[in-house]
C-alpha cells in the first residue's frame, strides 16, 4: 500500500513555533527530529555581545560609583541583549546615562543597520550621582565562544564576554504514533522551537533543514568522492612493533582474505525470542508449548490459527519476522 506523502503543519506565535510532520515511516520521527534539534541548538547563526568597554573600569571585578550593580552583574545583563542585524559586520552600541533611574537597553545608540529586539531589558540602576558610559561590541557567529577566544578588536581596556550566538533558546521534540487508513505503524513528529526574537522559529527551522541538506549532498556526489579518494594499498602492512623491555608472544597474523562459509552450512540458528515477535504473540505460542523456531516452522497457517490469541494480524506478524531470517511456515 502506498504511504501518503508527509505533510508539515506549522503554528507560529511570536518567538514560539510548533511544527507537526506526519505521516512518517516508523522510526523516521527520531531519525529526522534528532539531527534537526542538534543543528537548531548549535549551528544557527546569530548575534551576541563579545566585548564591553565601561568608562573608568579596568576589569570585570570592579564596582562603579553611583551604580547599584557591579560590573559582573552588568555584563550578565548585557548577555541577554538581543540585537538584530540588517547588514553584516560587527556593530558598536554606545550608552551614556546619568542621574537616578533604571537604565534600559533602549538607551543605547544603535547603528542604522541594526535594532535592539528587547529594549526593555534592564542594564543597570543608577543613583542620583551615578554615571554610566559604555561601548558594547556586537558580532555575528554560531554556537558558544568563550571570552578568552575573543581577540581584542576594539579599544584598550575593553572586557571580553562569553558569547552565546545561537538565536534558538530551546528545542524540544517527541514522536507519537499515527495512522493512515488501516496502516497504523507510522510516526508523527512534533517539533517545538523557542527563539530570542531576532530570528523567527520558521526561519530557524528552514535554516536547519538547509544545513542538514547541504551536509548530506556529499553522499549523492559519488563520482567526485570516488575521484578524490586516495587509492588504498592492496596488501596489508602491519604496524611497527612496540619496543619494550618485555618479550611478548608473537600474535598470529591477521588474514585479510576472509574464508567463505562452507556450502553445506545450515541457516544460522535463531531463538524464538530472537525473532522479534511482540510479547503477546510470544506468550501465546509458549502457552501452547511452541518454544522453538523449529517447532514454529513445523506448523501451517491453519495450525497457528487454532492457537488461542493468534489471529490474522498475529499470523502476518509471525510470517514477516520469519521471512527476515529466510524462514517460513509449513505449506
Swiss-Prot record:
Query: Which organism does this record belong to?
Result: Deinococcus geothermalis (strain DSM 11300 / CIP 105573 / AG-3a)
Family statement drawn from the similarity comment of this UniProt entry: Belongs to the RNA polymerase alpha chain family.
The opening ranks of the lineage are: Bacteria, Thermotogati, Deinococcota, Deinococci, Deinococcales
Which UniProt keyword terms apply here? DNA-directed RNA polymerase, Nucleotidyltransferase, Transcription, Transferase
The UniProt entry, under InterPro entries, shows: DNA-dir_RNA_pol_insert (IPR011262), DNA-dir_RNA_pol_RpoA/D/Rpb3 (IPR011263), DNA-dir_RpoA (IPR011773), RBP11-like (IPR036603), RNAP_asu_C (IPR011260), RNApol_insert_sf (IPR036643)
Q: What does this protein do?
A: DNA-dependent RNA polymerase catalyzes the transcription of DNA into RNA using the four ribonucleoside triphosphates as substrates.
According to the UniProt entry, where is the signal peptide? none
Q: Name one GO biological process term.
A: DNA-templated transcription
Q: Could you describe the subunit structure of this protein? A: Homodimer. The RNAP catalytic core consists of 2 alpha, 1 beta, 1 beta' and 1 omega subunit. When a sigma factor is associated with the core the holoenzyme is formed, which can initiate transcription.
**Protein name as annotated:** DNA-directed RNA polymerase subunit alpha
Going by the entry's taxonomy, the superkingdom of the source organism is recorded as Bacteria
Q: What is its EC number?
A: 2.7.7.6
HAMAP family in the cross-refs? RNApol_bact_RpoA
| Domain remark from Swiss-Prot or TrEMBL | The N-terminal domain is essential for RNAP assembly and basal transcription, whereas the C-terminal domain is involved in interaction with transcriptional regulators and with upstream promoter elements.
Q: Does the keyword Magnesium apply?
A: no
Q: Which GO terms describe its cellular component?
A: cytoplasm; DNA-directed RNA polymerase complex
List the Gene Ontology MF annotations in alphabetical order: DNA binding; DNA-directed RNA polymerase activity; protein dimerization activity
Q: Please give the catalytic activity noted in the UniProt record.
A: RNA(n) + a ribonucleoside 5'-triphosphate = RNA(n+1) + diphosphate
Record carries keyword Lyase: no
Amino acid at each position: 500500500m502506498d504511504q501518503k506523502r508527509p505533510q508539515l503543519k506549522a503554528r507560529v506565535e511570536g518567538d514560539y513555533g510548533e511544527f507537526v510532520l506526519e505521516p512518517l515511516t516508523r522510526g523516521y520521527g527520531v531519525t529526522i527530529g534528532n539531527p534537526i534539534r542538534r543543528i537548531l541548538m548549535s549551528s544557527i547563526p546569530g548575534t551576541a555581545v563579545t566585548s564591553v568597554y565601561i568608562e573608568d573600569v579596568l576589569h570585570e571585578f570592579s564596582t562603579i560609583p553611583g551604580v547599584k550593580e557591579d560590573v559582573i552583574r552588568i555584563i550578565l545583563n548585557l548577555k541577554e541583549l538581543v540585537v538584530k542585524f540588517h547588514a553584516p559586520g560587527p556593530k558598536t552600541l554606545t550608552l551614556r546615562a546619568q542621574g537616578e533611574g533604571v537604565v534600559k537597553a533602549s538607551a543605547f545608540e544603535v547603528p542604522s543597520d541594526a535594532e535592539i529586539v528587547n529594549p526593555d531589558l534592564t542594564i543597570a540602576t543608577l543613583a542620583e550621582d551615578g554615571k554610566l558610559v559604555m561601548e558594547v561590541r556586537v558580532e555575528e557567529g554560531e554556537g558558544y565562544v568563550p571570552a578568552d577566544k575573543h581577540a581584542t578588536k576594539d579599544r584598550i581596556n575593553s572586557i571580553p564576554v562569553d558569547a552565546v550566538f545561537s538565536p534558538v533558546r530551546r528545542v524540544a521534540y517527541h514522536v507519537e504514533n499515527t495512522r493512515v487508513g488501516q496502516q497504523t505503524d507510522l510516526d508523527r513528529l512534533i517539533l517545538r522551537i523557542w527563539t530570542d526574537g531576532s530570528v523567527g522559529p520558521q526561519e530557524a527551522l528552514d535554516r536547519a533543514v538547509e544545513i542538514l541538506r547541504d551536509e548530506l549532498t556529499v553522499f549523492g556526489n559519488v563520482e567526485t568522492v570516488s575521484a578524490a579518494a586516495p587509492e588504498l594499498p592492496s596488501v596489508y602492512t602491519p604496524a611497527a612493533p612496540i619496543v619494550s623491555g618485555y618479550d611478548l608472544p608473537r600474535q598470529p597474523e591477521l588474514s585479510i582474505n576472509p574464508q567463505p562459509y562452507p556450502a553445506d552450512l545450515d541457516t544460522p540458528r535463531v531463538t524464538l525470542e530472537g525473532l522479534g515477535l511482540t510479547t503477546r504473540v510470544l506468550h501465546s505460542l509458549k502457552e501452547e508449548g511452541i518454544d522453538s523456531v523449529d517447532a514454529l516452522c513445523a506448523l501451517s497457517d491453519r495450525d497457528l490459527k487454532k492457537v488461542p490469541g493468534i489471529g490474522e494480524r498475529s499470523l502476518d506478524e509471525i510470517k514477516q519476522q520469519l521471512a527476515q531470517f529466510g524462514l517460513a511456515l509449513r505449506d
